[in-house]
């Protein structure tokens, strides 16, 4: 009787075990381990934790309440973490969990016109950011063989810079000067001048006042610049960890467009605040201090950031990333630690002096201390022909003017040189938010360097150049188009411009002006 019962149960058991095997195949059960540590101390934007034995350098970690941080110090007994959010709700004893990944940010067309923080979270109350993909904030700079020479100009729309300190696409040009000398104004005017130039702009605000950033964003929006601009913000009250990663995150967002073959301009405002945030983190985490209490790798953190700005070879799309880092000096001390580091890293600097600013000369560019090491090769041929010797002659004029203050009797030729130099200085002045097209710049610079402004009273020079700009757009559009498209100024066009300006604008300065 027992054997028939077993025969009946056998197919039932086989069916049950087969069902078990099928479920196991469809729903694999795997144990997932999580490494969780305990926060032992917390404050001033950093935390220390134990129990994270396998955590890696700069790995993203998660605190309660979806607060995020980065592993910064890997000591034998504990891990030093930097907070990317405010830590008001955190306390010693709370858990911290590994994520197994590095910090990444959204990139793509969906960021254009948006204001975000260093983690990609929106700050403009316009909903979530739509992104093509996410990329890590720390990326390797392009290799040497992947780079191309800087040959295409980036027009700032500012005469003093485009004529004397030209910038090329893919260059790194430092803007340096004391506070309230117009550093941000130059960067903003450069962004405004990229309208209709197929250049994507990224403005990175580090440690700036919220009111100042809000005013700048409003200005960009009112002038239609936000359509091609991304603003990445870490205000002064943000955690030092967030301020530290902000320029790297902004560069990752900019690199996406560069790798798509587009030209990109990025402004870092400013890197002295970035250096101070890194110094604060390093001192709190007990890293050895060096000169001015900055850690020993402060040069490296800026070098690895700015080396990501370049011009790619045509085989890689031919895109470019132009960097305009800003750094603030104290009491015109250009030889301070961070400014000298950045001067040695970048391809030139635009130095703004408070002496010129206080005299009402805007932009307050000190031509003698400013230089562009690679931009000269990218300057438009038309501009190079017009302003080729202008830098040298203008520097000589400034020295001559200083000498003339002693009351020495001057020869007639010297007096004429002084008068022309003063008119050149007047022409180079330019109010904020009024970038000029390159054709208008060249016409005005041609007129002043050829002496056509010599008989115009200095107080009327500004009005004269405004008349020239308006008139050539209206009367000589063909020459403007040739300059804009080809960058060339033929001898015929040159003579036509000079004769037309002399006969129609400056013929009778008393009546015209």
From Swiss-Prot:
Keyword NAD: no
Primary site of residence: membrane
Enzyme Commission designation: 7.1.2.2
CDD domains reported in the protein's UniProt record: ATP-synt_F1_alpha_C, ATP-synt_F1_alpha_N, F1-ATPase_alpha_CD
Keyword Kinase: no
Positions with a binding annotation for ATP: 177-184
InterPro entries, per the entry: Alt_ATP_synth_F1_asu, ATP_synth_asu-like_sf, ATP_synth_asu_C, ATP_synth_asu_C_sf, ATP_synth_F1_a_nt-bd_dom, ATP_synth_F1_asu, ATPase_a/bsu_AS, ATPase_F1/V1/A1_a/bsu_N
Any GO MF annotation of the entry: ADP binding
Subcellular localization: Cellular thylakoid membrane
Gene Ontology cellular component annotations, sorted alphabetically: plasma membrane-derived thylakoid membrane; proton-transporting ATP synthase complex
Membrane-spanning residues: none
Membrane topology, from the record: Peripheral membrane protein
Annotated site residue numbers, Required for activity: 370
Record keywords: ATP synthesis, ATP-binding, CF(1), Hydrogen ion transport, Ion transport, Membrane, Nucleotide-binding, Plasmid, Thylakoid, Translocase, Transport
Catalytic activity as recorded in UniProt: ATP + H2O + 4 H(+)(in) = ADP + phosphate + 5 H(+)(out)
Function: Produces ATP from ADP in the presence of a proton gradient across the membrane. The alpha chain is a regulatory subunit.
NCBIfam families (UniProt xref): alt_F1F0_F1_al, atpA, PRK13343.1
Assembly, per entry: F-type ATPases have 2 components, CF(1) - the catalytic core - and CF(0) - the membrane proton channel. CF(1) has five subunits: alpha(3), beta(3), gamma(1), delta(1), epsilon(1). CF(0) has four main subunits: a(1), b(1), b'(1) and c(9-12).
Entry similarity comment: Belongs to the ATPase alpha/beta chains family.
Protein name: ATP synthase subunit alpha 2
